[in-house]
Amino acid sequence: MSVMEPLSANRTAQFRTLEREARFVSPPKDKSAYPLLYEAVEPHVGSFNALTEGPGGGLLNLGARDIGAKVVFDGKASDENPNYLGNKLALSVTQVSLTKPMSNDGVTAAAERNVFPAEARKRLTTYRGKLLLKLNWSVNDGEETFSEVRDCGPLPVMLQSNRCHLHKMSPQELVEHKEESDELGGYFIVNGIEKLIRMLIVQRRNHPMAIIRPSFANRGTSYSHYGVQIRCVRPDQTSQTNVLHYLNDGQVTFRFSWRKNEYLVPVVLILKALTDASDREIFDGIVGADTSNSFLTDRLELLLRGFKKRFPQLLNRRQVLQYLGDKFRVVLQASPDMSDYLVGQELLRRIVLVHLGDENTDKSNMLMFMIRKLYSLVAGECCPDNPDATQHQEVLLGGFLYGMIVKEKIEEYLQNIKLQIQADVNRGMPVDFKDRKYMTRVLTRINENIGSKLQYFLSTGNLVSQSGLDLQQVSGYTVVAEKINFYRFISHFRMVHRGSFFAQLKTTTVRKLLPESWGFLCPVHTPDGSPCGLLNHFAHKCKISTTQSDVSKIPTLLYSLGVSPAAHVTAAGPSLCCVQLDGKIVGWCSHEQGRIVADTLRYWKVEGKTDGLPLDLEIGYVPASKRGQYPGLYLFGGHSRMMRPVRYLPLDKQDIVGPFEQVYMDIAVTPEEIQNNVHTHVEFSPTNILSILANLTPFSDFNQSPRNMYQCQMGKQTMGTPGVALCHRSDNKLYRLQSGQTPIVKANLYDDYGMDNFPNGTNAVVAVISYTGYDMDDAMIINKSADERGFSYGTVYKTEKIDLSLSRGRGDPVTQHFGFGTDEWPKEWLEKLDEDGLPIIGSYVEEGDPICAYFDDTLNKTKIKTYHSSEPAYIEEVTLIGDESNKFQELQYITIKYRIRRVPQIGDKFSSRHGQKGVCSRKWPTVDMPFSETGIQPDVIINPHAFPSRMTIGMFVESLAGKAGALHGIAQDATPWTFSEEDTPADYFGDQLLKAGYNYHGNEPMYSGATGEELRADIYIGVVYYQRLRHMVNDKFQVRSTGPVNSLTMQPVKGRKRHGGIRVGEMERDALIGHGTSFLLQDRLLNSSDYTQSAVCRECGSILTTQSSVPKIGSMVTIRCRRCAISFDEAKKIITQQDSEDSIFIDDSHIWEDGQGNKFVGGGNTTTVAIPFVLKYLDSELAAMGIRLRYNVDPK
């Protein structure tokens, strides 16, 4: 396709039915037919592959090298010799390797066999390989060295990575191994569940960013809100953030965080420790030729004088390093035999600008550049960088995060060995470093299982880390790769989250769609609601680099283009342009020269003839401006960068651009927009800014934007086809559409991604007409005959696990066995169950039916487990699962897969592909449906009021295109932006309809199904692709008359699963009060809830002091008030004290007994009232706090 070729050249897609069928019957034996699918998942797979392959033996080996050695001594200091250390032992890991998943089935010394992912899914286990570490220990600096390979437990392995058996398999072989023909990988299988590490947005690596943050001022008395922050990344992808703070007295402080603690160091201390530079050299390095800038020179003078004043004793580099070493010895856990000077060097290596390794001169140059940038920010010469802009962001890939955690766990492992030996030394136990047996004894006491910690991370998404890994969150790293349908599945791999820290922020600035993200993040595909703008998806052409480009020859190229090397130039003024390569200052040149260098490099890299200049090199030239971004030429070739292809006009070839450089480039969207001497690039297609899902919305350029956002969400909730190999999966719940079709109207990308292998809906004849009145409020009417012929007929598969071993302890003998015993049991059970006690495949089960039988040795009795769901089902499949740790144990664990039929019901949710969702309100008999002159009856009727306010014109266009496509037997291309104001879709598809003998506008005269008369208006009717969503009334309806209640409050429990009730909340109560329906209110809130009858005393008004008396022979139980009654003995005393003639005679009927033999008199003035039980509960709770409730009782 040449640059000027119009985009609308070919508007007819192909159905490719036979080609697809042939590919389905015999999958390709070489490579996949859909390379785009693999590209979509590449960032995940590529980042995991980088752990074990690449420079230095992969990231895990680089990480092990970076950890270095842990040192321990076997000597104990005494009073005579306080510095005695003894023999020195240095522990290190020299090699890390990961095997492919294997299993010996619990039989020791047996040959291992390959384990494939389908088995892990089916058996609900974890797909994992062994993590092997080569542990080295040397005594007294190499006097004797030993090494041993340690098995650190099984580590979960990513599918389709280089450690997976499926790697490089052809579609044919994948099918043979019970996978989809295009198994993408990119996820892990943990306990049978597919888990995915989601991508996160982090700050761009190795680039100093000027920030104004009010929280900076809270760090201390004279701190200001100005700072320069750099996130430095080591070769093993772990990062360390360094920040420079500006203080109001002109000082600058260097801040870093180590093991979740923050430390602040004066920046001059760091500069003096890096090189033996004099004050004059530091002054020149920061000010350069800009000596007239009094703002800068005054502050620098304060900075240097302040250092002299505060640390007069530090005169040279050695003293500074010793001072730093002394202060940070404990923090860095340095070994006792290291001098302070060496600890100071270790501090610089581990914390200060770690991406520059041990190059202290480069670090010093970079630090001076950062100080200069900080002063420019304070002076207002440059603006702060926006951390929310894609320009200053990169992606934290799942594989790299996984590697970081493994590295940290290896370091903890070494630390634990060291602590164990130290504990032995302190206890005075015999310690011999040269004895291999002693070391073996130590190692057996250490928990070596690193794999289980990674499995915990994947299954919960929680990060347990000592250092925090320089990240802002501790949870939410993993998600389940749900296979509701294929759209949902593929979206997981293109999803990128801003971080859970930002979800709690009250401000909306982080959620805004910024123009910098053009072509990298999709503007449409983000959820509505709380994660809006935080959870984004990549544009479908956006790639993420998982390898480091070879940039070793670039400095030489730059010098040949007129850049002066950094070593020769001390000046750092704004008159010069700083040239940086991956965070290292290469040299300086003038701003005019900088632009020429950038343009020349771009021409050369696209031309591809210059050796050592990779195509994906990012060339970000920031021109000098007044109060704009800090100028310079920044080159990037590292990992984790977002990249996308555009066409480079001077050479008419593909160029790869990144978000940093794109801001300062002129890229035309369409060839028509190109202006000479302005635009250097043009987009391959305007749809490159959209994600995969947003591209599949037909004619999305005709819709109002929120509707396209809704469709991106609803496409993922569709009851579609999650995959073809459903019989080899045991998901808790799977949705499947039985009658899926290929859409007549589809975007070109639909075929490129092979979406026809996973149909997601049905082509329906849709009439837009207000008919029957059942279509109000977005409801839709379905033709009863269409429903009977299978319109949107779906199935739900549910899996139930039955484990007999749960009731017995570990190591106990098996007491429960599947099958029938010799005791008596109902013979009807055999109608549903086989002789082995397992259900018959294909049998129909209802609530209460037996699903398996087992014999219990302890009770000598046959028992059954029953089907609990109220929805009838068919037994689809029974899987017998063996024990992982013991191959020969008898069967204890099975899974049963149920097939539940789901015919569209009234109340089920449907939607078109334009965010037009609605529920089915009626299934209308065919005889009563309106029909057209050609005898066509609509499958679906929707109300015309659904369109005006929502402005989904794309649905009208789809209806036209679908009708024309159905009449001519062609597929229609619905790619956005193929039409224009002059060339409209109404004309294009209208002509097709005319040729087929239909109305140009898509309207047709229709006849009433009830009377047979022609309707007065012509009806808009056409073919629209409809999706059935997973929100079905059968999963949602909740109804109960009586059922379980809460034991404390006696009110109905909540939750549909537990047969709970529906809560009448405050709003509902207010509505009932507002309507004056007091009887309804009493019925709902009392009689139907926690109605109870309680005795209350009329005199003291208490419900807690009443109790029933012990009945006498021939008399009824009476309710008495314990508080108002007096004891029988007291009553007798009162009588004997009264000497008057009319002394009271106690009547027998007044005397009553409580349950403990105590006699009382009186307290009989009680009555029974109806109250909510929760009132009784409240009363007793208040009584516990010493508060008495008194009720006024009507004497009647």
From Swiss-Prot:
This is DNA-directed RNA polymerase I subunit RPA2. Its main location: nucleus. It comes from the Eukaryota. PANTHER family: DNA-DIRECTED RNA POLYMERASE I SUBUNIT 2. It is found in: Nucleus, Nucleolus. One of its GO terms (cellular component) is RNA polymerase I complex. It is an enzyme of class 2 (transferase). Keywords: DNA-directed RNA polymerase, Metal-binding, Nucleotidyltransferase, Nucleus, Transcription, Transferase, Zinc, Zinc-finger. Component of the RNA polymerase I (Pol I) complex consisting of 14 subunits. It catalyses: RNA(n) + a ribonucleoside 5'-triphosphate = RNA(n+1) + diphosphate. A zinc finger (C4-type) spans 1097-1124. One of its GO terms (biological process) is transcription elongation by RNA polymerase I. Belongs to the RNA polymerase beta chain family. It comes from Eremothecium gossypii (strain ATCC 10895 / CBS 109.51 / FGSC 9923 / NRRL Y-1056). Gene3D superfamilies: 2.40.50.150, 3.90.1070.20, 3.90.1100.10, DNA-directed RNA polymerase, subunit 2, domain 6, RNA polymerase alpha subunit dimerisation domain, RNA polymerase Rpb2, domain 2. Its EC number is 2.7.7.6. DNA-dependent RNA polymerase catalyzes the transcription of DNA into RNA using the four ribonucleoside triphosphates as substrates. Second largest core component of RNA polymerase I which synthesizes ribosomal RNA precursors. Proposed to contribute to the polymerase catalytic activity and forms the polymerase active center together with the largest subunit. Pol I is composed of mobile elements and RPA2 is part of the core element with the central large cleft and probably a clamp element that moves to open and close the cleft. GO terms for molecular function: DNA binding; DNA-directed RNA polymerase activity; ribonucleoside binding; zinc ion binding.
